[in-house]
Amino acid sequence: MSLKSRKISGKEYYLLNNEFYTGKVEITYEETGDLKTVGYFYEGLKMGEWYYFYEDGATERIENYLYGELSGIYMSFYKNGKLKEIGQMKNDKMDDMWYIYYENGNKQYENFYYLGKQSNGIWREYHENGSLKMECPTMSGYLYGECKEYDEKGYLIRKCFMRDSRKNGYEIEYNRSGKEISRTNYVSGVEMKD
């Protein structure tokens, strides 16, 4: 079976013999014949769950489609089978909470999205050992508010105020005993000299 694709009104449609294709599709790796992709089309559009596999047969990712657009749970995996990324999609855009993991299984990032943009909430990044690395409030897609950065042992090492994802105000660095070791002033992301 040889499907052809065609963009119509911004959506990717798949046709077989110039007709919108409805049915299951299985794509294999040419070299081995092992399964690469399994999914379903409805009237030329991707529909429902689609599975993608590594050459060794392990699941690479699972995507959900609604009339040709990513919509619903999205998951991707490392070759070792551990979860790499999970989140919601809506209208082909990230929507709701998203989590990204290190290959060892510890969380790397978490963030809240609304239709593809960082939404209001807290953006968090973690060290590979699982300890919190950085947290920043977000507003309307921008880092906005007091951001804090920690070392792998959990000690606060830096904090600064962000406005529109740019440093604005003092950035303060600390040693492990919590004593201030430097202070730098920023205005709209530009360091101000004393």
PLM regions with names:
Residues M1-D194:
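Glycine/tyrosine- and acidic-biased, solvent-exposed loop/turn segments at the edges of beta-strands
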